[in-house]
């Protein structure tokens, strides 16, 4: 290229699609990867390539691999799922584009949004184009993920024995966000040193979304949630399978208005998933509720947070999905400490009616759960709400 440029005076435009195939598919072949990275560095690094390359455009799932803490090709501008910059509106379909398609094809936008929205890049809500096109043409609300990627690739990742990884996955499956430090990830599929590296990789793969403002990861939508659930039900995730049974029992007991059983299960989950240090921390209250009611995600939307944690309570509203409104009531659940269980229920009633339920016409259960900070005993009382 240098010789051609010297003779013609013309520069090259180089386009490489899926630059990271060797990084992902040959993850254990370190010599192959080193040779490949050195080839790219020879092609793009230094002042000489600037003479004969007018533009280089490289696409892939992963950012450019790091050598120690620096990018192997630091003369590129990178746009990623962590920071899409000015390209944010071009990485997928924007919400306005999806609304237009829904109008054109007569699809229910709110349902499309629930299933396929969730990625936040800059000021944009970004949707997976493959999923949107499939749902508006086929009229089937389901996961189209398996047609563009395999969940089997993440089973070894989420099965790694990093402290806090499995709990973080369960929290996100329950609808919560988890804090993540994306800075240590080496941008490859091998050098994972902690749970944050795994979570960052899953963000780049699209299985998780990233909130840049609060530095948190979360599951973006129902489609991706379905795929992650498939992965967590594999044999290596025996702990999750057991936990899911426990959560199933909790939801059934709540719907049966079995106060004693709900108290026992919540207490057990609180003991298992809140460390001794954080057991009485206000912020752990929300995690206890969302984790405990993980199984509700089959029939309910992601829980709506009505009140902030930090004052000794956590308040959530669970609305059933449209296809389940005839069979499942809405749930208003409040967890408080050092209070009388009747007080918890009365406060739910006395508060201004939750905004998220104003237009809801189905049955409603209000669930008051309290625990004592000293003896850690939980109590529960459930009532059917009369409008």
Task: Describe each region flagged by the PLM.
Residues 1-281:
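Phosphate-binding site recognition
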Residues 3-8, 297-326:
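Active-site metal-binding core of divalent-cation-utilizing nuclease and nuclease-like domains
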Residues 22-24, 65-71, 341-344, 374-381:
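Switch/connector loops and helix/strand junctions flanking conserved nucleotide-binding motifs
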Residues 33-39, 337-354:
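Mg2+/Mn2+-dependent nuclease catalytic core
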Residues 42-50, 200-208, 290-295, 347-367:
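Metal-dependent nuclease catalytic cores in nucleic-acid-processing enzymes
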Residues 271-303:
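Acidic-basic catalytic patches of nuclease active cores, encompassing PD-(D/E)XK
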Residues 289, 314-318, 328-339, 351:
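Conserved catalytic cores of phosphodiester-cleaving nucleases, focusing on short active-site segments
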Residues 356, 362-387:
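Domain-level recognition of nuclease-like catalytic cores that cleave nucleotide substrates
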